[in-house]
């Protein structure tokens, strides 16, 4: 794109507005070199970068790259085998540190999905070894002692010599203080000296290095420290030589990585530039426009970026609209509207956010041409018209259907009739060439051209006749009208004169009345649109507020629910643990039988009713939401029917789950238990487990049921297992159990029947249905 348009529209001043948001010299250089692009993919990629940066700022408000120098010159010197100085190495050190920080930031970044920026983050290369080497130079420009063993040794000797000199001079100060002009150790020519009174200069042997301007003080290096000072001078030279060697070594370490370091520096600068674009967008209430795939554009509430408190206007260039002619008197803001359109296009095609509202859309033009100058002076000359025409000729010879043309005061500077005809002919040529054009003019003849010609539309700038001031509001579709009579009347011109003037221009007055009606309709429409926008904004704010309140309420509800559940569960667990502990102690001390333990526990329950969490609808719903994930082997559960805790041990092929509930194994469907989150309980001593079988597919009652299989057992063994099984079932509040004894000789079956008949906690028992085992299985109801 031609660079002339950048000067005409003051694009560099727009770029200067971004400077305050940039931290790195690399970003400043990128901004300086920024020019409009014509590749839609490149432009869209830069818009995507800004959008993704805004998402990063949602999660990390303080995201920043930090202040970094441009290291392109030091890297160039490295490629020429030159050694870098301390400041250049510090600059590279900071770039490497910033690269590592940015890489870590990306690794820790969450809740943000990146596409364009992802490619940049992943191209950053870390150099931990180089960073470690460069730590030998601190940010103050001092080479640390640990940079090399030799440097450390030299500085150790320097300190020893310096301490010896200081001690020697301190001794002289104490002994000969009366001979000194001041009681201090001075320095001259890099050597430690004493300020001796001139009258005593011969009393202290040594070398005179300086005399005060008054001649009263002589600065003498005592003979006792001359040798030490000589050694310090030599050590200083050795130190400089060693530091130069260290700088050379560090430069050699960096040399093979110049390309990668340069790439890191560019990425850091580019990230900083993207950050600056986002901050500009945020501060100026700018937006990222859409890109049209044809040459249509729509700018909503677009503002001129260089004006303070600019008036926002809507502007559109539909596909079937080629030329917009802004007519009307001067000083109304026509030129500003031209520049606003031009700058919006330049900014968008440079990958910058524009000052407009969401929904705005820009086109991509290969070239933008403008002829904009100050034509409002009454002292116009032929040279002005010649210059104007020269520019127009250049534009017409170069522009094509992929261009945007902006012309201010087309045809001005010559005879009005000829100028109007010339302007009309130029606009017609641009229209037939399908070149998007916006032109301003004060020629009334062009109003009719805009009305009568296809693909051409009139526009004007609103003028407030009440205040006699322009409002700078752009009215597309409404031609400009003269306000001379109204202004003259309001300024006090005799009404007779005004009427006479109006009678002389009856035709124009009719046209002006029509235009006035159009203006009124346009203003009314704009007011309605603004009202609709205000309502939309209020609705948006209200929706956000409601959503925020809902989220806060949901969060507090979940917290309180979880807190209540935890407190209740802790109370229940504590009560049960205490009761179990009491019963265990009783059992251990008095050797109570299991059924007596059951009786005792029943009495405890009657004395202090337990909270039945399984019937609490709110908690059940909360648990159901919390346990939305699929159950897994090892999960802690609560059996819904009994409120008992257990652990899932395996899953059967039919989808049911095997669970260990105390000493009993149970077969459960997925809807017969809920998952719970508990701390791992201390392991209890292993106890003999009861062998059980899977539950039959059909039973006489619903819900989970425990089973005992006694088939193949001897009488004594079977009775022991039956007694332990019934006790455990009662302890776990189970209402029904199944005992599989088979038919065989009938010995075990009869023994089971006798046991159940005499057990006080067995309400009733019966054989299972024929389909579930018949007389080979007994179902007992407990209570």
UniProtKB/Swiss-Prot annotation:
Protein's name in the database: Endonuclease MutS2
NCBIfam families on file: mutS2
HAMAP family tied to this protein: MutS2 (MF_00092)
EC number: 3.1.-.-, 3.6.4.-
Gene Ontology terms for molecular function: ATP binding; ATP hydrolysis activity; ATP-dependent DNA damage sensor activity; endonuclease activity; mismatched DNA binding; ribosomal large subunit binding; rRNA binding
Enzymatic class: hydrolase
Keywords: ATP-binding, DNA-binding, Endonuclease, Hydrolase, Nuclease, Nucleotide-binding, RNA-binding, rRNA-binding
Protein's job: Endonuclease that is involved in the suppression of homologous recombination and thus may have a key role in the control of bacterial genetic diversity.
Record-linked InterPro entries: DNA_mismatch_repair_MutS_C, DNA_mismatch_repair_MutS_core, DNA_mismatch_repair_MutS_sf, MSSS, MutS, MutS2, P-loop_NTPase, Smr_dom
Lineage: Bacteria, Bacillati, Bacillota, Bacilli, Lactobacillales
Similarity comment text for this entry: Belongs to the DNA mismatch repair MutS family. MutS2 subfamily.
């Amino acid at each position: 794109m031609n660079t002339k348009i950048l000067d005409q529209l003051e694009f560099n001043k727009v770029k200067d507005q971004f400077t305050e948001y940039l931290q790195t010299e690399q970003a400043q250089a990128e901004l300086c070199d920024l020019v409009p692009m014509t590749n839609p993919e490149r432009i869209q990629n830069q818009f995507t970068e800004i959008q993704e940066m805004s998402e990063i700022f949602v999660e990390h408000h303080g995201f920043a790259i930090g202040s970094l120098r441009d290291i392109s010159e030091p890297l160039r010197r490295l490629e020429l085998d030159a050694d870098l100085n301390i400041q250049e190495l510090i600059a590279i050190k900071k770039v490497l540190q910033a690269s590592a920080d940015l890489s870590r930031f990306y690794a820790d970044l969450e809740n943000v999905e990146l596409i364009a920026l992802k490619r940049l983050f992943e191209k950053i290369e870390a150099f931990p070894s180089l960073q470690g080497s460069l730590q030998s130079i601190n940010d103050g420009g001092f080479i640390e002692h640990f940079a090399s063993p030799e440097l450390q040794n030299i500085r150790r000797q320097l300190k020893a010599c310096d301490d010896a000199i200081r001690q020697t001079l301190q001794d002289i100060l104490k002994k000969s203080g009366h001979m000194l002009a001041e009681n201090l150790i001075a320095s001259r020519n890099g050597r430690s000296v004493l300020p001796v009174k001139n009258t005593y200069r011969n009393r202290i042997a040594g070398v005179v290095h300086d005399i005060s301007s008054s001649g009263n003080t002589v600065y003498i290096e005592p003979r006792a420290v001359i040798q030490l000072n000589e050694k310090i001078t030599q050590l200083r030279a050795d130190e400089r030589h060693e530091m130069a060697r260290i700088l050379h070594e560090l430069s050699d370490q960096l040399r093979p990585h110049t390309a990668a370091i340069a790439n890191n520096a560019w990425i850091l600068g580019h990230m900083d530039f993207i950050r600056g674009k986002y901050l500009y967008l945020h501060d100026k209430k700018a937006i990222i426009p859409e890109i049209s795939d044809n040459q249509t554009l729509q700018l909503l509430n677009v503002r001129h970026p260089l004006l303070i408190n600019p008036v926002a206007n809507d502007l559109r260039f539909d596909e079937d609209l080629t030329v917009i002619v802004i007519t009307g008197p001067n000083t109304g803001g026509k030129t500003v509207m031209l520049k606003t359109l031009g700058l919006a296009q330049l900014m968008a095609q440079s990958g910058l956010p524009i000052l407009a509202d969401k929904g705005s859309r820009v086109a991509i033009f290969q070239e933008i041409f403008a002829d904009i100058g100050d034509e409002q002076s009454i002292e116009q000359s032929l040279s002005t018209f010649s210059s104007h025409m020269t520019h127009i000729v250049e534009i017409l010879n170069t522009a094509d259907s992929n261009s945007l043309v902006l012309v201010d005061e087309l045809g001005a500077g010559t005879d009005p009739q000829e100028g109007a005809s010339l302007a009309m002919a130029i606009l017609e040529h641009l229209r037939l060439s399908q070149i998007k054009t916006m032109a301003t003019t004060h020629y009334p003849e062009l109003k009719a051209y805009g009305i009568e010609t296809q693909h051409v539309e009139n526009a004007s700038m609103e003028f407030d006749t009440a205040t006699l001031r322009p409002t700078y509001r752009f009215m597309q579709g409404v031609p400009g009208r003269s306000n001379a009579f109204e202004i003259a009347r309001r300024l006090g011109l005799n009404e007779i004169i005004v009427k006479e003037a109006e009678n002389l221009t009856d035709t124009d007055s009719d046209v002006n009345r029509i235009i006035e009606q159009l203006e009124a309709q346009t203003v009314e429409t704009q007011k309605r649109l603004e009202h609709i926008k205000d309502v939309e904004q209020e609705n948006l704010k209200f929706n956000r507020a409601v959503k925020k309140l809902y989220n806060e309420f949901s969060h507090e509800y979940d917290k309180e629910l979880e807190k209540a559940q935890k407190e209740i569960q802790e109370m229940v667990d504590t009560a049960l643990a205490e009761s179990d502990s009491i019963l265990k102690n009783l059992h251990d001390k008095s050797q109570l039988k299991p059924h007596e333990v059951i009786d005792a526990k029943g009495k405890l329950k009657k004395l202090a009713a337990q909270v039945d969490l399984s019937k609490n609808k709110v908690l059940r719903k909360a648990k159901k939401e919390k346990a939305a994930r699929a159950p897994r082997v090892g999960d802690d559960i609560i059996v819904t029917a009994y409120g008992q805790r257990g652990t899932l041990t395996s899953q059967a092929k039919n989808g049911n789950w095997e669970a260990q509930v105390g000493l009993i194994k149970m077969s459960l469907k997925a809807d017969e238990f809920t998952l719970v989150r508990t701390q791992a309980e201390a392991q209890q001593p292993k106890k003999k487990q009861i062998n059980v079988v899977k539950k039959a597919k059909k039973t006489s009652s619903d819900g989970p049921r425990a089973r005992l299989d006694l088939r193949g057992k001897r009488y004594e063994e079977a009775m022991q297992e039956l007694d332990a099984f019934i006790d455990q079932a009662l302890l776990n509040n189970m209402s029904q159990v199944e005992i599989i004894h088979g038919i065989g000789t009938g010995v075990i079956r009869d023994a089971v029947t006798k046991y159940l008949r005499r057990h006080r906690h067995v309400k009733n028992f019966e054989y299972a249905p024929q389909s579930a085992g018949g007389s080979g299985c007994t179902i007992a109801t407990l209570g």
